[in-house]
């Protein structure tokens, strides 16, 4: 995958934070998804569907684009405009109450959203794992704390994030939160390389939220935070 192939979709209308396409590109480079048009992927916390578009184009699979904040009807219109209306199904459900059939998905992808709803121990095993097929793959890319500042998110980030600072966790914390279910074959968690470019492309949109983030970048965001990649192979 080359995220530059999708640069025409990078705008203040489609981006809701640091460029999700760059985060997804790094995940796909390290752990490519080998899927077919018969496979189904859940894009959990898809936002305006930019990641769903890329997943659909890169894998050929059917994508279920789920987000709680963006109306399914709005994403459906976008997918039609992008020419992928038949390949991507927009969904509007709470990640805590997903209603899909069990063992349905060959892969789950979640970019810049998993930390909002999944920061409790046993969430993955109880709320996500039931919907994953045997031999499926999970790819997650989220903002978090550099490991040397583990457990200090509220102390260090509250000026920027307010009440949401507690959502930023370190690599070691995420390993513990995801757990070691009997169905997990492999789990890899690492600090991602796409930090600067993802943030810079967000700032380039001139979105009001991007401008707000930019004020804190040098003093808070850059010194203490990172993007965390997660790869999970299911037995």
What residue spans do the PLM features occupy?
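Short alpha-helix
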Residues: 166-182
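Conserved Class I S-adenosyl-L-methionine
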Residues: 188-235
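Short, glycine-/aromatic-enriched active-site segment of Class I SAM-dependent methyltransferases
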Residues: 143-165
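A short His-aromatic
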Residues: 115-117
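Class I SAM-dependent methyltransferase SAM/SAH-binding core
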Residues: 42, 48-97
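A conserved beta-strand element that flanks and buttresses the S-adenosyl-L-methionine
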Residues: 109
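A short glycine-rich, Lys/Arg-flanked "PGG" loop and its adjoining helix->strand segment in the class I
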Residues: 122-137
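Conserved class I S-adenosyl-L-methionine
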Residues: 1-35, 50, 200
